[in-house]
Design a protein with these regions (language model features):
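Mobile gating loops/cap/lid regions near enzyme active sites that modulate substrate access
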Residues: 70-74, 78-211
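Substrate-gating cap/lid region and adjacent catalytic-acid/histidine neighborhood
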Residues: 1-133
Length: 211
């Protein structure tokens, strides 16, 4: 399972106020009550500004990304790890920055890793993107992890030579592990504790949101 660091940035409303964040969430999840959206705004207060966006876009983006992609992915990983041998489940976070995305206030948006998985020009991407220049070195790292999954059902047997060993997710008893994929800086990591707490919050709303 996976998530990009800024999963919500391509989808979130360009909100100027907590009320607009609340309206955005109620439009997407109509069973949410006013009390629910008040709680969401409390979990995601005003954040540092991002280029080309209104004041509460960062909050809307972070909330939507975690509610819709990141936290469900983490819980699916944990569910598989509890149902299968936990060493058969892997999780990653993708943090490859492209200057144009950063300048547009999008960070690392949903599915930005696709060209690294399938190769430059094979994923409806711009061949003039950063993957052709300063992010080119992440391509063999990511691609060979995926090829190894296909060939061996694990990411490590056929991984790129200098890429780190990708530890399995774990069973949640002693924390869980994820790999942080970054150009010239891929490392093993853990899911941040503050994100774990926010995911617990979203889990409490899962039935209402039909997630």
């Amino acid at each position: 399972m996976q998530d990009d660091i800024n999963e919500g940035s391509d989808f979130a409303a360009n909100a100027s106020s907590p009320a607009e964040v609340a309206a955005f969430f109620q439009n997407n999840y109509p069973h949410l009550t006013i009390a629910d959206t008040d709680a969401i705004n409390k979990e995601y207060p005003l954040m540092p500004p991002l280029p080309e966006h209104a004041a509460y876009f960062p909050s809307a983006s972070a909330a939507y990304g975690e509610a819709t992609f990141t936290c469900p992915g983490n819980y699916i990983s944990l569910s598989f790890a509890n149902a299968l041998p936990p060493d058969k489940v892997w999780n990653y976070r993708y943090n490859v920055l492209q200057a144009s995305n950063v300048a547009a206030g999008l960070g690392v948006p949903h599915t930005f890793e696709s060209p690294a998985i399938f190769g430059l020009g094979n994923a409806d991407d711009d061949v003039n993107s950063s993957y052709a220049t300063y992010n080119s070195e992440i391509i063999p790292v990511v691609m060979l992890y995926w090829i190894s999954f296909v060939r061996d059902l694990t990411p490590n047997q056929y991984k790129y030579g200098s890429a780190p060993y990708w530890d399995s997710f774990g069973d949640g008893e002693d924390g869980v592990k994820t790999i942080l994929l970054q150009t010239n800086g891929t490392i093993m990591d853990t899911i941040p504790e503050d994100q774990v707490e926010r995911c617990d919050f979203w889990r409490g709303l899962a039935i209402i949101m039909e997630q």
